[in-house]
């Protein structure tokens, strides 16, 4: 009787993980759309490729999450503790700025520079999408779906799960090219994974991600504009 109960629980959990895997593959498929576009490089140069991809990912992923996944274990809002949030955000800032300073590498990625150089409304559209939209579906996919998948496959090993998820998170950011950026992304992802584990949900990692992108974008924009003033 106990074996039958265990098998039923295992089957149900396996079904849930299969749904999460489908969500992750949807994200990957949309992310790699530029590889199949003949004018992908031209769209990127004009600053149009990023908003197209982000918009597509959001309009497909968020509704599916809201309808099918938001009530599943670890995929809801979770709890929120300001002290934990503040500590983790300080850690993210240290990773973003102290680590490059210590390593002696302070150059801005070419993609980030190209975003700052975009004129008029294109820059602001990209900035709004980067700050408020991308973090929502990225956390749904990585700290939500992919975390659940890996946690199941790795026998409930939280640390191993966080490492694998963070490796995947850094790798899919195809707009970057330098190894130190991928290291920073990996460490930031570990911090966001800690937020997910501590809060047992996605609200805290989403808000951390939004605030991080806002600070980084604001500082880069200020650094770009100051020499011109």
Question: For the regions a protein language model found, what residue spans apply to each?
Answer:
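Short, Lys/Arg-rich, polar N-terminal cytosolic tail immediately upstream
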Residues: 1-11
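Alpha-helical transmembrane segments in multi-pass membrane proteins
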Residues: 13-68
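Residue-level signature of transmembrane alpha-helical entry/exit and packing/kink sites
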Residues: 15-23, 46-54, 80-88, 122-127, ...
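Alpha-helical transmembrane segments of multipass membrane proteins
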Residues: 26-34, 57-61, 91-100, 169, ...
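Short helix-terminus and kink motifs of transmembrane alpha helices
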Residues: 34-38, 100, 143-144, 148
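Juxtamembrane helix-loop-helix connectors linking adjacent transmembrane helices
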Residues: 40-50, 69-134, 220-221, 226-229
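Structural signal for the C-terminal ends of transmembrane alpha-helices
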Residues: 63-73, 195-197
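Transmembrane helix-loop-helix hairpins at the membrane interface
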Residues: 123-229
């Amino acid at each position: 009787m106990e074996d039958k109960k265990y098998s039923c629980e295992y089957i149900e959990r396996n079904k849930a993980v299969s749904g999460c895997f489908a969500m992750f593959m949807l994200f990957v498929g949309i992310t790699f759309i530029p590889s199949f576009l003949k004018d992908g490089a031209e769209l990127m140069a004009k600053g149009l490729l990023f908003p197209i991809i982000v918009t597509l990912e959001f309009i497909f992923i968020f509704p599916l999450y809201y309808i099918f996944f938001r009530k599943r274990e670890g995929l809801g809002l979770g709890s929120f503790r300001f002290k934990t949030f503040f500590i983790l955000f300080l850690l993210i800032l240290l990773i973003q700025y102290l680590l490059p300073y210590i390593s002696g590498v302070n150059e801005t990625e070419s993609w980030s520079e190209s975003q700052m150089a975009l004129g008029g409304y294109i820059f602001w559209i990209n900035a709004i999408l980067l700050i408020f939209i991308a973090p929502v579906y990225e956390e749904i996919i990585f700290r939500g779906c992919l975390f659940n998948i890996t946690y199941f496959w790795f026998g409930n090993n939280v640390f191993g799960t966080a490492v694998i998820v963070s490796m995947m998170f850094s790798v899919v950011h195809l707009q970057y090219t330098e190894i130190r950026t991928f290291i920073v992304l990996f460490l930031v992802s570990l911090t966001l994974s800690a937020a997910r584990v501590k809060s047992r949900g996605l609200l805290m990692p989403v808000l951390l991600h939004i605030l991080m992108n806002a600070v980084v974008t604001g500082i880069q924009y200020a650094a770009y504009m100051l020499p011109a003033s």
